A protein has these predicted regions:
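Cell wall/extracellular polymer interaction/catalysis modules
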Residues: 1-122, 129-140, 146, 152
């Protein structure tokens, strides 16, 4: 599996950090360093808002799914540019069928807001429009798929 992915760059999302802190990292595997970091929303489950992420792989759960993802094709959807996500683990195997995608949302700020949280998603890793442009530059330039790893 690993041989099929970009060996220089990985996207890491650390859901153990508060949503108001940068927790989505563009990581340089060759230099063992963070290239760029930003905020990312988490799923709130069946509530209107949750300070902490809710995790599930079930359809209609509104929860974030932990695990590794292959970033798939881009498309233009409800929130503009988005990338399909293909779950590679038992904890996120339903992501594609759940329509869990990587997309931006204008209410996700560019700067950290901690101790204040940011908005929630319905399970998608949702970033600011400017950070999605940074991700797009990496994804579109890569000859191999980029791996996204969401962990807690």
């Amino acid at each position: 599996m690993e041989k099929d992915f970009n060996k220089k760059i990985i996207f890491l999302v650390d859901m153990s950090l508060p949503s108001g802190k940068n927790r989505f990292f563009i990581y340089d595997l060759q230099n063992d360093s963070v290239i760029k970091a930003s905020l990312v929303a988490h799923g709130c489950g069946d509530t209107q808002f949750s300070f902490t992420p809710k995790f599930s792989n079930k359809k209609e759960s509104g929860c974030t799914s932990l695990g590794k993802y292959r970033i798939g094709k881009s498309y233009s959807g409800r929130f503009g540019l988005a990338y399909k996500l293909h779950g590679l683990d038992s904890t996120n195997s339903n992501a594609f069928n759940r329509n869990i995608v990587l997309h931006s949302y204008s209410y996700v700020p560019d700067e950290e807001t901690y101790p204040y949280p940011i908005c929630n998603s319905r399970g998608c890793p949702m970033v600011s429009p400017s950070f999605l442009k940074s991700l797009q530059a990496v994804i579109d330039k890569s000859k191999e798929p980029v791996l996204l790893w969401i962990f807690n």
